C-alpha cells in the first residue's frame, strides 16, 4: 500500500499551471526522484508536498490522512535544500540537535542521536566544529544529518548536491542513498541531473512544463523513454525518425540512412515513429574487417567525422549517408580501441538488441 498518494495536484501562478494535474504514489521506504529541466515545476511540487505552498486543486494523502489543511509544522517532514540553511551561529552539534530540542528530547537522547548521526555521515568527532569552516561536502552531510535527526516520516531533498563539483556529487550520491536506505525513510528527491536521478532513485517521475511525462524505475525510464523529450533529456544521442515495417521474415525500420533490421526479441511500440540506437550497439570496422563479417544485416558504409575520449570510453562521430550517429567503445584491458582516424572510410554494424523504440 502506498504511503503517499498525490492525485490531480494543480498549482498556478498568474494563470500559468506550474504544476498541472500531477498524480503519482510513493511506497514506504522508496526513494522517488522528481527529475526535469529548470522551471518544469518539480520544486514547486515539492513545496506543495511540504506544505510551504497551497495547491489550487487535487489531493495529497499521507498514511491515510488528507494533508489539505495540515500546516507544514505538523507534517513531520524533513527538508534539505541546495542552499543548506545551516545556522551559521551554531556549531555542528547544535545544528544537528536543533530539531531534537524542538521535540523536547532529553539531553542524553540528543547526545546519543547526534553522535550516531555524525558517525553515519562519516563526520565522527566534528561536533564542536564551526559549520562555516567545513567544506561544501561536509556541510551537505551535516544538513542531511540535521534533516533526518527528528526521525521524519518523509524526507524531502531539493537539489541537495547542485552547488558541488561533479566528483563530490558522484561520491555523495552513493552516500545519501546508502544512508536513506539504512534508516528506511521514504524520500522525495528533486534534481535536474539525470545521472543523479538514475543513481539514487528507486522510481523516477520525469516532468516537463508542469506535467508528468513518464514514471518508472531508472532502468524503465532510460531504456524505454516515453517520447522524444524523455529520450533527449535522459541523454540518448542516436534518435532516429522513420517508419516501422514488418513481413514474415523480420521487423525493420526504414529511416534516412537505410533499412534497419530490428530484434524479434523486443516489442516495438513506435507511437512517435522513432528509435534509439544505443551508442554501445554500434561496432566499427575497416573495409578488410568488414569483408570477413558473415551477415551484412545492419552493416553500413560510413565516414569517421569525429573522435573523442569521454568518461572512460571513446566516442566516434560517424556519418552514414546524411545521418550522424555516435558510437562508443570501452577500451579493452590493454587500452586498445578501433584504429580509425577522422576522415577515414569505415563500416558500422548495428546490433539490433541495442535498439529501443518509442
Question: What feature does the model see in each segment?
Answer:
Residues 72-78, 82, 86-229:
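ABC ATPase nucleotide-binding domains
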Residues 247-358:
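Non-catalytic connector elements of ABC transporters
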Residues 58-66:
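Conserved ABC transporter NBD signature motif
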Residues 50:
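Helix-to-loop junction immediately C-terminal to a conserved catalytic motif
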Amino acid at each position: 500500500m502506498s504511503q503517499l498518494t498525490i492525485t490531480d495536484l494543480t498549482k498556478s501562478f498568474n494563470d500559468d499551471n506550474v504544476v498541472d494535474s500531477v498524480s503519482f504514489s510513493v511506497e514506504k521506504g522508496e526513494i522517488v526522484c522528481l527529475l526535469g529541466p529548470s522551471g518544469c515545476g518539480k520544486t514547486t511540487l515539492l513545496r506543495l508536498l511540504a506544505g510551504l505552498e497551497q495547491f489550487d486543486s487535487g489531493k495529497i494523502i499521507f498514511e491515510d490522512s488528507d494533508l489539505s489543511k495540515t500546516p507544514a509544522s505538523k507534517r513531520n517532514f524533513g527538508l534539505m535544500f541546495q542552499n543548506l540553511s545551516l545556522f551559521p551561529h551554531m556549531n555542528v552539534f547544535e545544528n544537528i540537535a536543533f530539531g531534537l530540542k524542538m521535540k523536547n528530547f532529553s539531553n542524553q537522547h540528543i547526545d546519543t542521536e547526534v553522535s550516531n548521526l555524525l558517525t553515519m555521515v562519516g563526520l565522527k568527532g566534528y561536533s564542536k566544529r564551526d559549520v562555516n569552516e567545513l567544506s561544501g561536502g561536509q556541510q551537505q552531510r551535516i544538513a542531511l544529518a540535521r534533516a533526518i535527526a527528528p526521525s521524519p516520516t518523509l524526507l524531502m531533498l531539493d537539489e541537495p548536491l547542485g552547488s558541488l563539483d561533479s566528483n563530490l556529487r558522484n561520491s555523495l550520491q552513493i552516500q545519501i542513498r546508502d544512508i536513506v536506505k539504512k534508516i528506511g525513510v521514504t524520500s522525495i528527491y528533486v534534481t535536474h541531473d539525470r545521472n543523479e536521478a538514475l543513481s539514487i532513485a528507486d522510481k523516477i517521475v520525469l516532468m516537463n512544463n508542469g506535467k508528468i511525462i513518464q514514471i518508472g524505475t531508472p532502468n524503465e525510464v532510460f531504456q524505454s523513454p516515453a517520447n522524444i523529450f524523455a529520450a533527449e533529456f535522459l541523454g540518448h544521442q542516436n534518435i532516429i525518425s522513420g517508419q516501422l515495417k514488418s513481413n514474415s521474415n523480420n521487423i525493420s525500420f526504414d529511416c534516412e540512412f537505410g533499412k534497419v533490421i530490428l530484434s524479434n526479441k523486443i516489442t516495438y511500440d513506435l507511437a512517435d515513429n522513432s528509435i534509439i540506437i544505443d551508442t554501445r550497439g554500434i561496432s566499427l570496422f575497416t573495409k578488410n574487417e568488414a569483408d570477413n563479417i558473415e551477415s551484412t544485416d545492419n552493416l553500413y558504409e560510413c565516414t569517421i567525422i569525429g573522435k573523442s575520449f569521454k568518461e572512460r570510453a571513446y566516442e566516434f562521430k560517424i556519418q552514414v549517408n546524411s545521418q550522424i550517429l555516435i558510437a562508443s567503445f570501452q577500451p579493452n584491458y590493454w587500452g586498445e580501441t578501433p584504429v580509425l582516424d577522422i576522415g577515414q572510410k569505415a563500416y558500422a554494424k548495428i546490433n539490433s538488441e541495442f535498439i529501443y523504440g518509442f
